[in-house]
């Protein structure tokens, strides 16, 4: 990536609809796509699943970056997501997520500020904004809950 743009390649791998995708920056990290039987063989992510995972990864990266910038030491972080599908056209109409954060000396106000900043700074969130309803929440894990997530 030399000018801020991204390049990727997607290649058909069988006689159905299994594909492998790579990016120019990660040519050795293959992402497999497929679809449900009988159209596919269920040997990879479906497109909307991968979109949900991509959204979650981008949002998580932004959240953790912001928390560390605030001087927080993160013991545990988990983001659970749910995508609500619509028909005609098939797409995600709503993404709901809940972040569970285990960090010392973090307040509810700091969590709320981090959520607002994440919405502004997350590239994938910005990409879906206006097309997909996003409802996000975050909560602080107790010390006991942190131990369960290790």
Language model regions located:
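Short glycine/serine/threonine-rich phosphate/pyrophosphate-binding segments
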Residues: 61
């Amino acid at each position: 990536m030399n000018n801020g743009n991204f390049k990727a390649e997607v290649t058909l791998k069988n006689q159905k609809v299994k594909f492998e995708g790579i990016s120019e920056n990660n040519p050795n990290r293959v992402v497999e796509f497929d679809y449900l039987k009988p159209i596919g063989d269920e040997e990879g992510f479906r497109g909307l699943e991968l979109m949900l995972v991509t959204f979650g990864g981008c949002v998580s990266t932004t959240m953790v970056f912001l928390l560390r910038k605030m001087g927080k030491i993160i013991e545990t972080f988990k983001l659970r997501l749910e995508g609500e599908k619509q028909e005609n056209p098939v797409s995600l109409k709503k993404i709901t997520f809940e972040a569970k954060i285990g960090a010392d000396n973090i307040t509810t106000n700091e969590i709320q500020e981090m959520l607002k900043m994440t919405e502004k700074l997350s590239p994938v969130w910005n990409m879906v904004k206006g097309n997909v309803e996003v409802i996000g929440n975050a909560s602080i894990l107790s010390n006991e809950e942190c131990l369960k997530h290790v």
